[in-house]
Amino acid sequence: MDALPLVQTDAGQRLVGHLLRHHRRYLSGAIDPDVRFRDFQNHVVHVDEGYWGGAPRVAHQWYDRMLRYLRTDRFSDAAHAAGVLSHYFTDPMQPLHTHSCDLEAVIHRPLEWSILQSYESILADWKSDDMRVVFRLSDRSEWLGEAVLHGARFANHKLARLLA
């Protein structure tokens, strides 16, 4: 939801309106991959293991589903699909979702809990940082998968610092 103010196109603003109107469905969709689907192999892109993981594929599936719902005026369902999509899109941007090892398994939950507890501070720091990462999305049909893979590669560069 924090990214919604960054949306700039008219079509994007219409989608933002639907997401805000159906925010409960959006938010429930955002946690469904963890609590309902529990398909954790689809939350990752292991960069150093030949890009193993299903995040790009499943993100495309939920994106297509969201578009189908939008075209048929099923805006509540579209908001839910957008929430699910947001999970599969952002999880590979967490460095520990880009590699698997024994140490990663030990620190994963505590790190995610710490991020959750510090989220407001992290967001404020990001907003005030002139060096923050904002990437533009392509108009090409492959844009979504490319963005997920790019995010995973970027996150993977931060992995060694977390595991040190």
Description of each model-found segment:
Residues M1-H80, P95-A164:
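N-terminal, motif-rich segments that launch catalysis or mediate targeting to/interaction with membranes
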Residues H87:
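Divalent metal-coordination and catalytic microenvironments
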Residues T90-Q94:
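Short active-site segment of divalent metal-dependent hydrolases/proteases
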Residues G83:
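Active-site nucleophile-His-acid catalytic modules used for acyl/amide transfer and hydrolysis
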